[in-house]
From Swiss-Prot:
Keyword presence, Lipoprotein: no
Swiss-Prot/TrEMBL GO biological process terms: response to symbiotic fungus
Keywords tagged on the record: Copper, Disulfide bond, Electron transport, Glycoprotein, Membrane, Metal-binding, Signal, Transmembrane, Transmembrane helix, Transport
Disulfide bonds: C77-C111
Species classification: Eukaryota, Viridiplantae, Streptophyta, Embryophyta, Tracheophyta
Subcellular localization, as worded in the UniProt entry: Membrane
Bilayer topology: Single-pass type I membrane protein
Record: residues binding Cu cation: H64, C105, H110, M116
GO cellular component terms attached to this protein's record: plasma membrane
Annotated protein name in UniProt: Blue copper protein 1a
Length: 161
């Protein structure tokens, strides 16, 4: 009986922890892709980027490209040499280190006038996600409290069963 309890606890732990360990592919711009006149700041605002995740840039390679730049080049929309551009139309960038990351399109005025630029903050692999802004919605508070109470009840039931 005790061994089945241990197996159950380990199984539940593995399921809960596996969601943390799985890398995420972030499709930049979602269904719009990497294009002009899109608010990438707004797009990135509710996303959590972690070491091991991927950024996927989908775009028409005849019209756009992707440069990874630093903060200074990002602000001024200045680009490295053209041969450093990613230009396949389906570029995948693995986020290997934590910190700020900057990406721009180097075609014409796409960065400076058409907002084709993205800045993100990459968190360490196991770091907790930033807290969302406080909600005034009483329903979300009740839902969260209900989830915590249910998790505690299940844990107690497993331990004392």
């Amino acid at each position: 009986m005790a061994s089945s309890r241990v197996v159950l606890i380990l199984s539940i732990s593995m399921v809960l922890l596996s969601s943390v360990a799985i890398a995420t592919d972030h499709i930049v711009g979602d269904d719009k892709g990497w294009t002009v006149d899109f608010d990438y700041t707004q797009w990135a605002q509710d996303k959590v980027f972690r070491v091991g995740d991927n950024l996927v840039f989908n775009y028409d390679p005849a019209r756009h490209n992707v440069f990874k730049v630093n903060g200074t080049l990002f602000q001024s929309c200045t680009f490295p040499p053209k041969n450093e551009a990613l230009s396949t139309g389906k570029d995948i960038i693995q986020l290997k280190t934590e910190g700020r990351k900057w990406y721009v399109c180097g075609v014409a005025d796409h960065c400076s006038a058409r907002q084709m630029k993205l800045v993100i903050t990459v968190l360490a692999e196991g770091a907790p996600a930033p807290s969302p802004p406080p909600s005034s919605d009483a329903h979300s508070v009740v839902s969260s409290l209900f989830g915590v109470v249910m998790a505690i009840m299940v844990a107690i039931a497993v331990i004392f069963a």
